[in-house]
UniProtKB/Swiss-Prot annotation:
Belongs to the JUPITER family. GO terms for cellular component: cytoplasm; cytosol; nucleus. InterPro entries: JUPITER. Keywords: Acetylation, Cytoplasm, Nucleus, Phosphoprotein. The modification N6-acetyllysine is found at K11. GO terms for biological process: endocytosis involved in viral entry into host cell; regulation of calcium-mediated signaling. This is Jupiter microtubule associated homolog 2. Monomer. Dimer. Interacts with TPCN1.
Amino acid sequence: MFRGADGQASKSGFRSMKPPGGESNDIFGSPEEGVPSSKPHRMASNIFGPTEEPKNIPKRTNPPGGKGSGIFDESTPVQTRQRLNPPGGKTSDIFGSPVTATAPLAHPNKPKDHVLLCEGEDCKSDLKAATNSTPRGEQGEKGSSTEAEPAKIPEPIPTVDSHEPRLGPRPRSHNKVLNPPGGKSSISFY
């Protein structure tokens, strides 16, 4: 067994009370300062105490080189813009201003042969006059020999064989699923 400097048997598990370099923990050899640092330890937590703010850092209320936020300036009334749709709808006459109902604009991709809803007999008579005046004007230019022919030629009903690809996919007459959700299988069921 190892005997220490004082002649007693040393037990393996105890540290020596005095390390070989002395009691100092300073490994760089600088003289110890007895004055503690004025800064609080940055890892120390003081959640219940008063907050300590550094005194030498100036507080900024405005961003550097920027314009002030205007929070503390005198407030000016905000201009409210006029609503496009009044509270009661477009034909509402709450405020006494005459508002005329306008027809909704058609979407450019929608077909333009839809019939607009009209109120009263005026719209029906205008619609009939507009449809009847165009064929009569064309017939008057061509001559009186074409008056015996019908003014409107019925359009042929499209069939599966005369399908145009730009109108969408051809309707299917079978049960086969081409793109199933789990992926295409090599087994085919008929």
